[in-house]
Amino acid sequence: ISQVLDTKSSMVSGADALPDSAEAPELEFRHVSFRYPQAGADALTDISFCAAPGETIGVIGGTGSGKSTLANLIPRFYDATDGQVLVRGEDVKTLQLQALRTRIGVVPQKALLFSGTIRENLRWGSADASDEALWDALRAAQADGVVRDKKGQLDAEVEPGGRNFSGGQRQRLTIARALVRKPELLILDDSASALDFATDAALRKALSKLPWKPTVVLISQRVSSIRHADKIVVLDDGHMAGLGTHTQLQ
């Protein structure tokens, strides 16, 4: 464990602060390609699209098409092999890593909850969040009913891995945790896959009405989940097979 903790990250932080505002798109991929170390082929090839502040970008494709890889390049979990990923017109490689990541909310495919209480889990998003802010996030994530049904509500126990919650409940709680931070850029990586269609639709409606109007990257294998996005990126084996609205792509 000590060796792991002492290992230095190969990800070098940039020096620039994230601009408070810019006329440039909130998010832009500019001819981005990515190849994993020792891989024989690119996982992503020549991906280009942009999202204005407050827009929702849908990303769809089959298993192994590169959706999660695309998501991981935005907060610099990996760096693009070629091309640029830009936030507010600035290459993410030039930005201070902490400043970049504190403005991004990422909800991965596998919902992860920690041992403790629901309140403690949600406050990983923002340590000083008020109970009112927690309930606001829960309502937006369609998780307030889940918490109200638990004895103790916000003080209800969360077992290791969230095993005392269903898959759909864990997903909604992890989305709520991301919303507590009020991120300016929200990445949902197939993180509503366990939700029924009605709850998924209610979640998307709530996200569109968030008062701080985040830019949303919504990754899904369900057409119904992304059909109302402002733009849809269609991935096929790491290549961009389409870009446009649902109507344009039909």
Region locations from a protein language model:
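Cytosolic ends of transmembrane helices, especially the final helix of ABC transmembrane type-1 domains
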Residues: I1-V4
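ABC-type nucleotide-binding domain
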Residues: D6, M11-G14, D20-Q250
